[in-house]
Amino acid sequence: MEYFAKRIIPCLDVKDGRVVKGVNFVGLRDAGDPVEAAIRYNEEGADELTFLDITASHEGRKPIVDIVKEVAKEVFIPLTVGGGISELSDIYDLLNVGCDKVSINSAAVKNPDFINKSSKRFGSQCIVVAIDVKKIAPNKWHVFIKGGREDTGLDAIEWAKEVVDRGAGEILLTSMDTDGTKAGFDIEITEIISKLVHVPVIASGGAGKMEHFKEVFEHSADAALAASIFHFKEIDIMDLKQYLHKNNISVRIN
C-alpha cells in the first residue's frame, strides 16, 4: 500500500559509539559521531532518522540509551531506534528518552509474540519490524538475523505478512544482496512486500545515486533509507528531494 509523501531516511549504523558503514554487513569503516551526524541530517531536511546499534543483538547488549538521549535532544524529526531490543522495558526506556519508534529484528524472530505484546502496550505506530532478506533461489528470499550472520530459514514474504498481522506498524526491509553496493535498491522484493502489506515499507540497501530513489518509489516503497551516500556527502538530501519533486515523486520540501 502506498502513502502520500515519500520519506528520505538517513540511517546511523552505530558500533562502539561511532557511526560506521560497511559493505554487505562486513568491512566496517568509521563515518563519524552519531550526535553530529543527526544534527546535520536534521538541518538538511531528512524526514526521519533511523539509529541502529548494529552489534547489540549479536553481543547481547542493551540499547545505547545514553547516546539516543543525546541525539533526541538535538533533532526535531522522528527518530527510530533499533539494536538489542528484546523486552518491553527496553522499548519504554527508549521512548522515555525521546525516540519515536523502535525497530525490532532478532527478538521478533526468536519470540514473535513480542510483536503482539509491544504493539498492544505502546501502539503499532511506534513498532517497526526490521527484516533483513537474502535471495536464496528464484522467487525465494530468507530472513536473516544478527546483522546478517544467521539464516533463520523463514520465508521473507510470509514473515512480512505475519509481522503485520501481529501488530507491526511499519516494515524496514533491507536487502543483504544490495546493501552497501550502491548499485540500486532491491526492487523485486521491495515491490512484492510493499504491495502485499497494508503498512508502510521502508526500502533499505543499495542506494548509490538519485535515480535509485526515484526507481524504488515508483515501485511502491513508502520510504527509502540510506547511510553511506549521506554520511560521506555524496548526495545532499535537499538536492535529492528537489530531483524527486521534478520527477513527480511527492516529497516534503521545507
Swiss-Prot record:
Keywords of the record:
Amino-acid biosynthesis, Cytoplasm, Histidine biosynthesis, Lyase
Whether Cytoplasm counts among this entry's keywords is yes
Q: Does the keyword Lyase apply?
A: yes
Pfam families listed in its UniProt record:
His_biosynth
**A GO MF term:** lyase activity
Q: State any GO CC term.
A: cytoplasm
| One of the GO BP terms on file | L-histidine biosynthetic process
Q: Which residues form the active site?
A: 13, 132
Q: Which InterPro entries match?
A: Aldolase_TIM, His_biosynth, HisF, IGPS_HisA/HisF, RibuloseP-bd_barrel
Question: Gene3D superfamilies, alphabetically?
Answer: Aldolase class I
Q: Where in the cell is it found?
A: Cytoplasm
Pathway named in the protein's UniProt entry = Amino-acid biosynthesis; L-histidine biosynthesis; L-histidine from 5-phospho-alpha-D-ribose 1-diphosphate: step 5/9
Superkingdom of source: Bacteria
**What are its E.C. numbers?**
4.3.2.10
Q: Which reaction does it catalyse?
A: 5-[(5-phospho-1-deoxy-D-ribulos-1-ylimino)methylamino]-1-(5-phospho-beta-D-ribosyl)imidazole-4-carboxamide + L-glutamine = D-erythro-1-(imidazol-4-yl)glycerol 3-phosphate + 5-amino-1-(5-phospho-beta-D-ribosyl)imidazole-4-carboxamide + L-glutamate + H(+)
Role, per record? IGPS catalyzes the conversion of PRFAR and glutamine to IGP, AICAR and glutamate. The HisF subunit catalyzes the cyclization activity that produces IGP and AICAR from PRFAR using the ammonia provided by the HisH subunit.
Subunit structure comment from the entry = Heterodimer of HisH and HisF.
Which family would the database say this protein is a member of?
Belongs to the HisA/HisF family.
The entry's protein name is: Imidazole glycerol phosphate synthase subunit HisF
Lineage start: Bacteria, Pseudomonadati, Campylobacterota, Epsilonproteobacteria, Nautiliales
